[in-house]
């Protein structure tokens, strides 16, 4: 988190080379600029973002998103089945929005979904994101394994990437809304 001119940003510094990083983030930022809706955060790729004694490294700057992770929200509302069921519907709207805009986040998991006031959802961490212009590429990451299909490979890189992840979260929220006692037996931290 950094603050400049009374605005907060999240800053991600890349300390190792990733395939076509500039081209990927260029495609992502261009696509997101044309997408309306409350779920995505403005981001900017800066190829010469930070200079240290060992070299110059690219950064991605995103608007800061206040709120709590989906995991924290679930833990806080574990005894409120209505809130968990409402979150299921909110996540379904988010999934539909991404699908309708040809986007896959690439790493849907509780720590990449921020719940803001009023249960508004925002996605963060776009490193594995798919947009149509990236169709010729492979994925740079496979996402948090607890939320990815076991057969997922780098070549599986298209707009349907998030379907399995959203289904897992939907099923988990439904189960927890009916049996909150499952949470302490199955949760393993922020990415559970």
What residues fall within each predicted segment?
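Helical subdomain adjoining the active site within ATP-dependent kinase catalytic cores
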Residues: 175-192
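ATP-binding glycine-rich loop module of kinase domains
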Residues: 1-42
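Conserved protein kinase catalytic/activation segment
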Residues: 112-124
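Conserved activation segment of eukaryotic-like protein kinases, specifically the C-terminal portion
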Residues: 137-151
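Conserved end of the kinase activation segment
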Residues: 151-160
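Conserved structural core of kinase catalytic domains
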Residues: 39-86, 136
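Catalytic-loop of the protein kinase fold
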Residues: 95, 99-111, 115
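Activation of the activation-loop gatekeeper triad in protein kinase-fold domains
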Residues: 125-130
